A protein has these predicted regions:
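Short, structured segments at the rim of ligand-binding sites
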Residues: 1-171
Length: 171
């Protein structure tokens, strides 16, 4: 939880409702963990851009997940992914699921929501986090989606299909 506090703060400002149920240490005793309960929430786009910063700022690995979250927030969200050259280009893949995006340049994308995502067949982007956000968006899309070339996801997330199915996904 120590490295997600800023992300949770941004989500709270967007209207995300959750409750911390339990705080505890990881098995090795070095990391603080929590169990969360989430509640249905009406999200609103933040007035400021969402961008990663060095610690204690928003973690660069978590920034792409705000792109799929922005598809469900009322208003327009600016995601500024300045660290990785051209990674924001991969966020345009959300359009195949009927997201409403506008790529300003290879680092900045505007996402307008809320959007009712629809099933589609998509080839997985080669970058891990953009591939993961397509998978997450597909889980929230109406209908049955097909995600091809999932090597990057399998490489980066151990047993992801089993873990998501345990949470109620149908993959």
């Amino acid at each position: 939880i120590d490295f997600l506090e800023l992300e949770l703060l941004k989500l709270e400002k967007m209207g995300f409702k959750y409750k911390i149920l339990k705080r505890y240490k990881s098995e090795n005793g070095r990391t603080n963990l929590v169990d969360l309960r989430t509640y249905p929430s009406r999200l609103t786009a933040l007035p400021d851009k969402i961008e990663a910063r060095p610690y204690p700022g928003l973690n660069i690995d978590n920034l792409p997940f705000f792109a799929v979250i922005a598809t469900q927030a009322r208003g327009t969200t600016l995601i500024h992914d300045w660290v990785y050259e051209g990674r924001a280009v991969h966020y345009k893949e959300l359009d195949k699921l009927r997201a409403e995006t506008l790529l300003a340049d290879p680092h900045r994308i505007y996402i307008t929501g809320p959007t009712k995502l629809k099933a589609a067949e998509v080839v997985c982007p080669p970058a891990l986090r953009p591939a993961a956000i397509i998978l997450i968006a597909m889980l929230g899309a109406e209908g049955v989606s097909v995600l091809r070339n999932i090597y990057s996801i399998n490489r980066g997330y151990e047993d992801i299909i089993e873990r998501l199915n345990a949470l109620g996904a149908k993959i």
